């Protein structure tokens, strides 16, 4: 028999359910919130606080405690984001008359530029899979689609047949916060997807049926982690330093290379599914740094 939840744990679970069902937060985000908020509840229990009466000063105490635990600034910022959302919810649901988290100050974060690949490196990465193998033909189509669309890895591995129109050349994506967007695929990606659908997909599915466009070797939905391992495998073949990579390396390359060729920032924002333009603007810094590097390497007076 499972252990009964405390009142505070019950409130957190109600909050997480709301984030999941009504706000459309991704499973990974909800799991992260649950983990972060469990730390808060544990600290509160040890210090005789409850969610319905902890004050701003109490939350500041918790913030100080987090600093003493040597968490990275990014981790502390993420934890404070979860706390703010929780207390906004409790205030909205009238569990509390106030929101004690409203004045909490987040740690200052260094600007982190996305890891950048040159066009030549992207070409090498896209050429690494052997399309004679059904598995690598799938990977080739996935890599081409990632670079052509800038999808998030979670959006790619969960892409279904009904959300892709090869005739119209677009994919329909349900992004963060349940926001839907249409993204054009480009001829190259379409050709490789068609080849995979005709020659490789049925071999991976075997006797199983699935609406997932890119099934795993067992005919099921691939995990993000599995695809990340595949990217690293091809990076080694392409002679790319794995340290330069992240799971979203082709999403970053998509955005940076579009901007390098003069794409409008707001168009790139729309294609990436960013709700805030400032999130997209970071790619302009990458593009600028790349231009400076090229200038330094090739200009006679640099």
UniProtKB/Swiss-Prot annotation:
Pfam families on file: Phage_int_SAM_1, Phage_integrase
UniProt-listed PROSITE patterns: CB, TYR_RECOMBINASE
Subcellular location field: Cytoplasm
Positions of the Tyr recombinase domain: 112-296
Keywords: Cell cycle, Cell division, Chromosome partition, Cytoplasm, DNA integration, DNA recombination, DNA-binding
Annotated GO CC locations: cytoplasm; Holliday junction resolvase complex
Core-binding (CB) domain ranges (all copies): 6-91
Biological process terms in GO annotation: cell division; chromosome segregation; DNA recombination; DNA transposition; resolution of DNA recombination intermediates
GO molecular function per UniProt: DNA binding; tyrosine-based site-specific recombinase activity
Top-level taxon: Bacteria
Disulphide linkage map: none
Active-site residues, record numbering mapped to chain: 152, 176, 248, 251, 274, 283 (o-(3'-phospho-dna)-tyrosine intermediate)
Keyword flag DNA-binding: yes
Function: Site-specific tyrosine recombinase, which acts by catalyzing the cutting and rejoining of the recombining DNA molecules. The XerC-XerD complex is essential to convert dimers of the bacterial chromosome into monomers to permit their segregation at cell division. It also contributes to the segregational stability of plasmids.
Additional remarks: During infection by the bacteriophage CTX-phi, it is required by the bacteriophage, which uses host XerC and XerD proteins to integrate the bacterial genome.
Family: Belongs to the 'phage' integrase family. XerD subfamily.
Quaternary structure (record): Forms a cyclic heterotetrameric complex composed of two molecules of XerC and two molecules of XerD.
PANTHER family per UniProt: PHAGE INTEGRASE-RELATED, TYROSINE RECOMBINASE XERD
Protein name: Tyrosine recombinase XerD
Organism in which the protein naturally occurs: Vibrio cholerae serotype O1 (strain ATCC 39315 / El Tor Inaba N16961)
Lineage, broadest ranks: Bacteria, Pseudomonadati, Pseudomonadota, Gammaproteobacteria, Vibrionales
Gene name of this polypeptide: xerD
């Amino acid at each position: 028999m499972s252990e009964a939840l405390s009142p505070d744990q019950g409130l957190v679970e109600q909050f997480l359910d709301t984030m999941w069902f009504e706000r459309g937060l991704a499973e990974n985000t909800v799991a992260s919130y649950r983990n972060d908020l469990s730390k808060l509840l544990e600290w509160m229990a040890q210090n005789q606080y409850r969610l319905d009466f902890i004050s701003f000063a109490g939350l500041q105490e918790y913030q100080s405690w987090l600093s003493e635990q040597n968490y990275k600034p990014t981790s502390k910022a993420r934890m404070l984001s979860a706390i703010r959302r929780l207390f906004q919810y409790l205030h909205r649901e009238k569990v509390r008359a106030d929101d004690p988290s409203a004045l909490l100050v987040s740690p200052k974060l260094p600007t982190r530029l996305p890891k950048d690949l040159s066009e030549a490196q992207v070409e090498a990465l896209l050429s690494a899979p052997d399309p004679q193998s059904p598995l690598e033909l799938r990977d080739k189509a996935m890599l081409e689609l990632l670079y052509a669309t800038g999808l998030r890895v979670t959006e790619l591995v969960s892409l279904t047949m009904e959300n892709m129109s090869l005739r119209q050349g677009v994919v329909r994506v349900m992004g963060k916060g349940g926001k839907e967007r249409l993204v054009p695929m480009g001829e190259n990606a379409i050709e490789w997807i068609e080849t995979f659908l005709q020659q490789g997909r049925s071999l991976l599915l075997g006797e199983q049926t699935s609406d997932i466009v890119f099934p795993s070797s067992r005919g099921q939905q691939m995990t993000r982690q599995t695809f990340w391992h595949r990217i690293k495998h091809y990076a080694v073949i392409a002679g790319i330093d794995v340290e330069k990579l992240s799971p979203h390396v082709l999403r970053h390359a998509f955005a940076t290379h579009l901007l390098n060729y003069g794409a409008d920032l707001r168009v790139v924002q729309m294609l990436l599914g960013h709700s805030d333009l400032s999130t997209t603007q970071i790619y302009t810094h990458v593009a600028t740094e790349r231009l400076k590097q090229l200038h330094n390497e090739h200009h006679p007076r640099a």
